[in-house]
């Protein structure tokens, strides 16, 4: 940290892409672990083991990026997602373009090559992620204008701050509020003297 009394503060989104998809298709996900939420549906259990939790993560990302198998359409989130992909593809073929859900930017057929339904959906998802982040970072920077702390690094699902301890817990709570957007995108918080010694502080800051 550049501050005498400072630390690095990292805030990252929990399962960012699935939550963006939920926002796009109008599906309400729980604020706690979605891998546990989906795992219970995949395995038909009220409680899942650690092995099933890890398997749930792999299944979810395979379905989102590799296509949704017919067997998993019965899981409501994925059934609704598959229907959205089908309608998106039909619109793309009919009109020659689709628009991003958030900023309404067109994605034109003549600029995208070798497309298929799932590839188009992944293009749209990545574009939506960028648009969500641009809006969120603008709001974060507006908030930071009144403080010493600074945003120093952005990756697709996390922000890293050089945090001045003088700014206090109040700023951390405000940053969490800006990023989670009324609970739509839950945020995990870590802090440490450097990037290699970050400690999870999510449960301590609320």
For the regions a language model picked out, list residue spans one by one.
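Conserved catalytic core of nucleotide polymerization and phosphodiester-bond processing enzymes
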Residues: 1-206
């Amino acid at each position: 940290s550049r501050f005498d009394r400072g630390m690095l503060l990292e805030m990252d989104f929990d399962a960012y892409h699935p939550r963006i998809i939920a926002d796009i298709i109008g599906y309400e996900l729980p604020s706690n672990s979605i891998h546990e939420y989906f795992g219970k549906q995949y395995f038909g259990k009220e409680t899942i083991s650690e092995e099933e939790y890890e398997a749930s993560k792999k299944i979810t990302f395979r379905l989102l990026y590799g296509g949704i198998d017919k067997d998993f359409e019965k899981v409501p989130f994925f059934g609704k997602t598959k229907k959205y992909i089908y309608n998106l593809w039909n619109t793309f073929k009919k009109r020659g373009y689709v628009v991003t859900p958030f900023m309404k930017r067109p994605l034109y057929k003549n600029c995208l090559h070798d497309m298929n339904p799932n590839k188009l959906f992944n293009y749209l998802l990545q574009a939506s992620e960028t648009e969500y982040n641009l809006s969120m970072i603008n709001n974060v920077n507006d908030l930071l204008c009144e403080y010493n702390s600074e945003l120093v690094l952005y990756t697709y699902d996390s922000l890293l701050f050089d945090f001045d301890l003088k700014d206090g817990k109040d700023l951390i709570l405000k940053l969490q509020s800006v990023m989670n957007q009324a609970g739509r995108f839950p945020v995990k918080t870590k802090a440490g003297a450097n990037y290699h010694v970050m400690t999870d502080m999510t449960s301590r800051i609320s």
